[in-house]
């Protein structure tokens, strides 16, 4: 499929806009939490289902690697985030002609990875605050960046399952001719 320079620029602009929107929303919500709540403070939104709970996550998404030595963990997690940033950016730039689902997925992953990396570099931890429990099972607190990364990965998976080829808009031929 051939893509014009203009179309490629539009794809890249949209990709950048989605990534920056995720980054802004992530950092804005984390800022609200850190300014209005104390660490480990909870505010119930939906009883027995959803709380806002301020957690300082020194591990990875959903608390993974929380027990790893802090000096090794910082290097490991920051390195992973930088590698993800480089791979996702390079792939997105090379595949701007691919599906919208792929581009949105990559943009969500990039925005989320950068959001959590900023926290880790600035604070040494990631601010988590979305706290869900379902049928008595508690899920580790997470944030907007984690959500964007998970949705982005799901979109990449869906993109691998099938193409979303959309025919180009154009004049519809008249019936019978």
What spans do the regions from the language model cover?
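Alpha-helical transmembrane bundles and membrane-interface segments of multipass inner-membrane proteins
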Residues: 1-177
């Amino acid at each position: 499929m051939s893509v014009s320079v203009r179309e490629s620029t539009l794809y890249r602009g949209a990709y950048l806009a989605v990534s920056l929107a995720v980054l802004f929303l992530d950092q804005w919500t984390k800022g609200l939490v850190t300014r209005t709540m104390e660490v480990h403070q909870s505010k119930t939104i939906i009883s027995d289902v959803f709380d806002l709970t301020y957690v300082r996550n020194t591990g990875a998404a959903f608390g993974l690697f929380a027990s790893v030595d802090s000096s090794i963990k910082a290097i490991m997690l920051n390195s992973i985030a930088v590698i993800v940033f480089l791979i996702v950016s390079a792939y997105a730039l090379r595949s701007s002609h691919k599906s919208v689902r792929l581009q949105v997925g990559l943009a969500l992953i990039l925005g989320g990875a950068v959001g959590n990396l900023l926290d880790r570099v600035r604070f040494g931890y990631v601010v988590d605050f979305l706290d869900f429990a379902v049928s008595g099972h508690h899920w580790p607190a997470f944030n907007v960046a984690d959500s964007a990364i998970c949705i982005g990965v799901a979109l990449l998976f869906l993109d691998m399952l099938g193409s979303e080829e959309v025919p180009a808009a154009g004049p519809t031929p008249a019936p019978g001719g």
